[in-house]
Amino acid sequence: MPEALALALYAAALRLLTPFYLLRLWRRGAKEALYRHALGERLGLHSGHAEPGRLWIHAVSLGETRAASALIDALRARDPALRFLLTHSTATGREAGESLLRDGDSQAWLPYDTPGAVRRFLRHWQPRVGVLMETEVWPTLQREAEAAGVPMVLANARLSEKSLRQGLRFASLMRPAARRMTLALAQTEADAERIRMMGTARVEVAGNLKYDIAVDPALIARGQAWAAQLGRPVLMLAVSREGEEAALLAEWVKQPAPRPLLAIVPRHPQRFDEIAALIEGAGFQLARRSSWAGEPPAEALQADVWLGDSMREMPLYYGLANVALLGGSFEPLGGQNLIEAAACGCPVLAGPHTFNFAEAAALAIQAGAAQRCRDLAEAVSRGLLLCANIGQRDAMAVDAMAFAAAHRGAARRMAESVLCLA
């Protein structure tokens, strides 16, 4: 199919779907109010005047925003006068991004990928360069940015074999979008090769920004202090996805007492209440992190399961846990970021599905920072053994921190490449 026809059909479909997207956001805003904030921005509608020439970074959700924080720090270190525009697509991303703003910076929703919305967005902000985090490539945005003379960079770029196949299925849309990318800064050589196959001409291997994310030592220390108060080991399911919590609870109920404390930290905040009901329905005494502000109360210290229903406290949870089971890896979802756990010195047990972080998982296992398990049953068994074996657990913790430290430097490399275009 010719590119022009493919783009026209794509834009027409998005225009038809836009009212339904907006209605969905409004309904979602009943639980997460931020989704109802500034809905006009989704259509590229902005009030007032914006100072042109900002460095624009788009981070779709929480994980991408945290990776962007390392890049922003590196860019500011090289040019303190830079002013940023941060855009997001999810409430968790926007909430996390707000903490990265300084005087003169701005924040907005990324507009829907229709020609009118994207043109209005680019006319209003007039960025000097656009940086898209990880996998965000939008056909209309790429075309309109090229027309407006805005160089576009795909930073911390990754592309799995599955995503490559999907992209090639829609080659008339995605190949031109990839060709219009000024520069892609890939996490690995394998990612770089797949991105070149999509059509991007200039691709550099820069490493993974997630090794450079600063972890708050005060939060780690707080988690460690809580662990000392508990007086028993802690096994955690970290950044869990749908289906994993129920499967873990089914395994956990089989384990003989006395058991370690089980902590569950879900990936999506809208599922907190659902997971709480699952835990109580399985017959366990539950303590919710959101129920106390200071030190954990006595009833929490005696609970069977802690639910990590708070935001931006993962270093605290990794400081609390003796061993972390990697969420998203026990269902075919690609896994979650294990680098943060390693940086906090928390040993990781991963399931079979880590294709979204394939190289990081392989390197962590090779370094002794993580172990691979066939399924949750094996992970629980190994986790209990590690909880009981202080020497092996401490050795994995040391290896984890060394692994994380050895792979830093991507933020500096990416900042230098981006500033060459700005």
What residue ranges belong to the model's regions?
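Nucleotide-activated sugar donor-binding and catalytic core shared by glycosyltransferases
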Residues: 1-422
